Amino acid sequence: TTAAVVLAQMFVAAPFYIRAARAGFESVDQRLEAVSSTLGARPWRTFRRITVPLALPSLAGGAVMAWARALGEFGATIMFAGNVAGRTQTMPLAILEAMEADANAAIAIAVVLAGIALAVLIAFRGLARAGSRAL
């Protein structure tokens, strides 16, 4: 099912995001959070207005790493969800299947996948630059 594909992708990609998020949150200066508290901000507001914005570059980087890892995943997807065309088949699985029958089709799918990945990474880079200018 589609849910099995999502779970398989999350299982494989989550450690990449968690590691980056943890590093981002650990890099936030606790003195800034303490100052926010002394000025009367509640913990949730401190988290939302101080901690998350300062950790955002790491959170975004972790999301990109997790996405990139999930994009190329096929082992866990085959094990958990199978390889049913039109239902649970991801692009890497389609490439794998096409390699057995038609190498040109596999190359075409791989080029499309690489184009999608490149477009997303370029868009992320543009957003990251815009975000760094806003800070």
Give the location of each predicted region.
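Juxtamembrane helix-start elements in MFS-like secondary transporters
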Residues: T1, T46-F47, A106
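Loop-to-helix entry region at the N-terminal start of transmembrane alpha-helices
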Residues: T1-F16
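Transmembrane alpha-helices
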Residues: F11, I18-A21, F25, D29, ...
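Interhelical loop and adjacent transmembrane-helix boundary motif
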Residues: I78-L118, A123
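C-terminal transmembrane helix and the adjacent membrane-cytosol boundary/short C-terminal tail
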Residues: P15, R19-S37, A41, I107-L135
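Short, contiguous hydrophobic alpha-helices characteristic of membrane insertion segments
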Residues: A3-V6, A63-A68, I78, V120-R125
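Hydrophobic core positions of alpha-helical segments in small-molecule transporters
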Residues: L7, F47-V52, F80, I109-V112
